[in-house]
Amino acid sequence: LRTDFGVQSDLNPLAEAWVLSCHPDGPSYLPDGTMLADYLAAHPEAAGTDCKKFEMFPVLTKFIDAKNSISIQVHPSNEYALEHEHQYGKTEMWYVLDCEPGAFLYYGFDHEISREELEERIRNNTLTEVLNAVPVKKGDCFFIPSGTLHAICKGVVVAEVQQNSNVTYRVYDYGRVGADGKPRALHVKQALEVMRRTPPEQHDFSPHLAKCDYFTVDVVAGGYTGTADETSFVSLLITEGEGRLTCGGETVQAKKGDSFFITAAAVPML
């Protein structure tokens, strides 16, 4: 992330970069040092009228670089998360930016499984035998509704667009230990309560890459002209190359790894 996407961070290893966030665990800042969340609290019209139906800013965007496989995990629905965690649940999508040869990820189950078998496989560390292991290539997209068991595996880099939430229930972590030398906490009880035990559904969001109540994602290449009307902001994430962004008479340079927040009702951008 540092070398290819220009991420500046003291974290080591650097596995994630939150590039559009109003979440307190990793807030985004404007160039003048103002937190994006504070700016939107003072200027709610900048987020757009569609955001008024949400108690909190609805979206969080990040880069993820899985140098090692991420824990097998699940995210709860809004209903469960608001009741038990006091924040939103998490529906998300992944867009594969790069991957090593032979890379794959886990995406739900390869067949329907009973709760009893699932509990047994978690206990005896055979969970991966029934997961849907999907080979990946650059440009692949995966839509992951809340309740879907999933994991990004070693050698995959993705852009993730998700609900504004940081609730994760881990069910398997490959026996790894944390910095304190102890196994990282699992959340099996909660995971069993929210998990879908069936194969993932197929989704076709054409002409969009992904679309749900919380976000719409498109991929554009080369020149692009668009507008942000009063209904919603536009977030631009540069995943390849470099160029120029013009909006409101101002032109700025844009390069791989940059993230731009275009306020609702902004003038055309190029």
Question: Can you annotate each of these PLM segments?
Answer:
Residues 1-113, 168, 173-198, 217:
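Transition-metal
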